Amino acid sequence: MHLMLVLLGLAALLGTSQSRTGCYGDVNRVDTTGASCKSAKPEKLNYCGVAASRKIAERDLQSMDRYKALIKKVGQKLCVDPAVIAGIISRESHAGKALRNGWGDNGNGFGLMQVDRRSHKPVGEWNGERHLMQGTEILISMIKAIQKKFPRWTKEQQLKGGISAYNAGPGNVRSYERMDIGTTHDDYANDVVARAQYYKQHGY
């Protein structure tokens, strides 16, 4: 009896730890076409698509790993898949490599997740927990806006729509098939999802 209770408790604990980052869907179940050639070309790649996204994510992995524990901590706190946070960080700042003193986008984007100071007041250090919390909370607000706008979409479709909205706002997401039209290089969610799937395979 005691052993049964211990096993049940362990099963509940494992279930909780899994669900603690899966509130907004499973990124591995999201379809993606990966990076457009417009995103691949500046990275000096002569191919596009999922392979290009994965190659860029691979190049960023060493820098990303410096923040792995922090990304996972924030993901658990906010119930967001850490791989999705990592995918956004790779796309936005190459895990910090593209920033000058923590800033990018001509001085408008702050931190690893490039919080736009024209829309939000950046908080914390550019590579710290408060910044990652803020960026991830912005992502959650976008996912929730898409959930409200498209209630019949699956969780995974809403997750992808929220990622697209993180770049161009929920108003830009007009249909599932064309959600990335109007995002940077017209591929934002597809590229981020493909990178996130790579990071998922590398312990995020």
From Swiss-Prot:
Q: Is Secreted among this UniProt entry's keywords?
A: yes
Primary enzyme class? hydrolase
Q: Name one Pfam family in it.
A: SLT
Q: Name one GO molecular function term.
A: lysozyme activity
- GO terms classed as biological process: defense response to Gram-positive bacterium; killing of cells of another organism; peptidoglycan catabolic process
Q: Does the keyword Ribonucleoprotein apply?
A: no
Q: Which residues are annotated as active site?
A: E92, D105
Give any Gene Ontology cellular component.
extracellular region
> What keywords appear on the UniProt entry?
Antimicrobial, Bacteriolytic enzyme, Disulfide bond, Glycosidase, Hydrolase, Secreted, Signal
Q: What is its EC number?
A: 3.2.1.17
Protein family: Belongs to the glycosyl hydrolase 23 family.
The protein's role, per its UniProt record: Has bacteriolytic activity against M.luteus.
- Further comment: Shows preference for N-acetylmuramic acid residues that are substituted with a peptide moiety. It acts only as a glycanohydrolase.
The protein here is known as Lysozyme g
